[in-house]
Each structure stands twice: as C-alpha cells, then as structure tokens.
C-alpha cells in the first residue's frame, strides 16, 4: 500500500485543503495518486461546499465526488452518529474493501479521515482503527495557534501507541502577524514529539483558487520529504513510483 492517511488534531483544521493540495502537487509531478474520504457528514458528496468536491477540485483526479466519498450524509455530526440517525450502517470492512478497489486505478491514495483519530467512524470502528487497517504513514494537520502543542503531541502519542508511523505535521492557517508564535509552536512540537513539522501552510482568506493553494503547498510544504515516503513505500511493494 502506498500513500498517506491525513488526520488532524480536531475538526475544521484544514485536512481537506492539505490533502487536496498535496495530492494536486503530486499529480502535477507525474504521480498517479488518488484521493479517498470514505465517510463525510455535513454535506452530501455532490455538494460543491463539501470535502469530496474540494478534494476533487484541488487534486485534479478524474474520479467523481461519489467515488471519492462513497458514504455521505448531510447532518453535521460524527460519521457514526450521523449514519445511525439516518438509518444507515457502514462497517470497517466496506470502506477498506473500497480502498482496495481504488488501488486498481491509482498507484497511491491520499486518504482523509474525519476530525481526529478517536472520532467514532463506522459502526464498528474509530478513525484510528481504519488507519491501522491501511498502515499508511500519517500526516497530522494542526492549528498553528494557542493550544496546538498539547493537541498535536497527544495526537502523535496516540498514533504511535497504536503502532502507526507519523510522517510529519503540517500547521495550517498560519498568519504572517503570528509567525513568531507559530515558529515557537513548531519547534516545541518537534522537540516533544520527535516528529518533524513539514509545513506551515498560510491562512487563505475568503475565496481561493486551486492555483493559489497548490502554489502555497509547493512553497510552504516540504513536498520532497513526502516524496521520499511514497518512493520508499513503492519500492517495498515492488511497484513503480509513478
């Protein structure tokens, strides 16, 4: 298996922008990568304001929104609760099997979870259980501001305790006027967790274009470090890297 599992310290931190941007940059570099968000609550998959639609636009994948996100519900609750209230049951095996189907089309997949690792996800699993099934290296997306050191270090410790590899952290929503504090938080996260912060993605105010996001990802995220993970995974699997 090749790719990344994108998780976060909380909801509304910037996972979708980060996942879509990194996937879009990798596709521009010639990698055959896809995006996958198994469950989405808050919007149905076809809603242009939803995560599946944003992933499609930013990544530039040919797959449709309902293929990127096969299970979606409009109510903005934790996925397990939202599905239960709608009378729907989704099991861990279903979303894992779908992942394996997508791998027939793509060499690598960037998988976005929901909220953080302990979020109730399918009927029988938390987000972290799904991450353990895939065994992809994690990218942890976190806020750059007050409180982020605690949240990020706890997320990394929880992931490591479950045997998962954390490729790095990306602080999303960095404002120029706060960069001194952001840099201090970056250094503290690295010191306390032993995991590198691979990017300080700027805050996007108002409407933004795909081009703006991808250019920012190229400038502010260490894409070459992420490339090393993809290439190493592909070499272990005996598969081509592009």
Curated annotation (Swiss-Prot):
- Main location as per UniProt: cytoplasm
Q: Where does ATP bind?
A: 12-17, 51, 112-115
Reaction catalyzed: (7R,8S)-7,8-diammoniononanoate + CO2 + ATP = (4R,5S)-dethiobiotin + ADP + phosphate + 3 H(+)
Q: Look up the record and give one Gene Ontology term from the biological process aspect.
A: biotin biosynthetic process
Disulfide topology:
none
EC class of the enzyme, as a word: ligase
Binding of substrate, residues: 41
| Coiled-coil spans in chain | none
What's the cofactor? Mg(2+)
According to the UniProt entry, its GO molecular function terms are: ATP binding; dethiobiotin synthase activity; magnesium ion binding
Signal peptide boundaries: none
Superkingdom, natural source? Bacteria
Keywords, A to Z?
A: ATP-binding, Biotin biosynthesis, Cytoplasm, Ligase, Magnesium, Metal-binding, Nucleotide-binding
Q: Look up the EC number in the record and give it.
A: 6.3.3.3
Q: In which pathway does it act?
A: Cofactor biosynthesis; biotin biosynthesis; biotin from 7,8-diaminononanoate: step 1/2
* Residues given in the record as Mg(2+) binding sites: 16, 51, 112
A Pfam family reported for this protein in Swiss-Prot or TrEMBL: AAA_26
What the record says about family reads: Belongs to the dethiobiotin synthetase family.
What quaternary arrangement does the UniProt entry report?
Homodimer.
Q: What is this protein called?
A: ATP-dependent dethiobiotin synthetase BioD
Q: Which gene encodes it?
A: bioD
């Amino acid at each position: 298996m090749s790719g990344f599992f994108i998780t976060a310290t909380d909801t509304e931190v910037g996972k979708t922008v980060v996942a879509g941007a990194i996937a879009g940059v990798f596709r521009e570099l010639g990698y055959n990568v896809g995006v996958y968000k198994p469950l989405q609550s808050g919007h149905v998959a076809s809603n242009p304001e939803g995560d599946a639609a944003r992933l499609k636009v930013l990544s530039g994948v040919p797959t449709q929104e309902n293929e990127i996100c096969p299970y979606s519900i409009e109510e903005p609750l934790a996925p397990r609760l939202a599905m239960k209230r709608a009378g729907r049951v989704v099991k861990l095996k279903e979303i894992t099997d779908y992942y394996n189907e997508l791998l027939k089309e793509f060499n690598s997949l960037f998988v976005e979870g929901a909220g953080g690792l302990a979020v109730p996800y399918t009927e029988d699993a938390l987000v972290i259980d799904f991450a353990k099934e895939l065994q992809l290296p994690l990218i942890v997306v976190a806020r750059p501001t007050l409180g982020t050191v605690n949240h990020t270090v706890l997320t990394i410790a929880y992931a490591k305790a479950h045997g998962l590899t954390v490729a790095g952290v990306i602080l999303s929503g960095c404002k120029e006027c706060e960069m001194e504090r952001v840099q201090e938080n970056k250094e503290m996260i690295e010191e306390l967790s032993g995991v590198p912060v691979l990017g300080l993605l700027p805050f996007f105010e108002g409407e933004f274009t795909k081009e703006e996001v991808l250019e920012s990802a190229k400038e502010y995220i260490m894409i070459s470090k992420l490339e090393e993970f993809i290439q190493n995974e592909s070499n272990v699997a005996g598969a081509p890297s592009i």
